[in-house]
Amino acid sequence: MTPTVASTVVDRPAAEVFSYTTDPTHFPEWQQGLVDGHLEPAGPAQVGSKCVTTRRIGGANRAVTSVLTHIDAPRAWGVRGIDGPVRATVDVTVEPLTETSSRLTIAVDFDGHGIGKLLVPLIVRRQAEKEMPANVEALKRRVEAQ
């Protein structure tokens, strides 16, 4: 299917935008419903690192693991979900516009497994389409406030 895409111009250099956007410990600061994020193993991100995020769903915390599929700092970063009924593929691109501003684009797509095959088209895609613009604007505000 077609990914859900949100984009904005951030008044910060590409390296700053990339660093903040791709640090899982910052994810709860700008993603609705996310309560925790971290890399395994801890340390600098590299292809194959696991990105573990915990989201509040239906009154319970649910952890999901993704694997880092590509990284080209400060331009591109991507993860692919490897567990759970709904697995996201996320691609982040940061395009420098000037020395002090960048275009940030985040694309998210979903693959359903088991019950997730029903959830993705009925709930998950619609929720992502609703949340992504607000999430990206929250991220923009956070980065620009630093």
Predicted segments — roles?
Residues 30, 71-72, 97:
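A short, compositionally biased micro-patch
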Residues 38-85, 103, 110, 134-146:
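Glycine-rich portal/gate segments that line the openings of hydrophobic small-molecule binding cavities
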Residues 80-134:
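Beta-strand/loop substructures that line and gate deep hydrophobic ligand-binding cavities in soluble
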Residues 7-11, 38, 67, 93, ...:
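Generic structural detector for well-ordered beta-strands
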Residues 1-46:
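Hydrophobic ligand-binding cavity/cleft-lining segments
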Residues 15-18, 133, 137:
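Amphipathic alpha-helical segments that line or abut small-molecule/effector binding pockets
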Residues 3-5, 61-65, 87-91:
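Short, surface-exposed coil-to-beta transition loops
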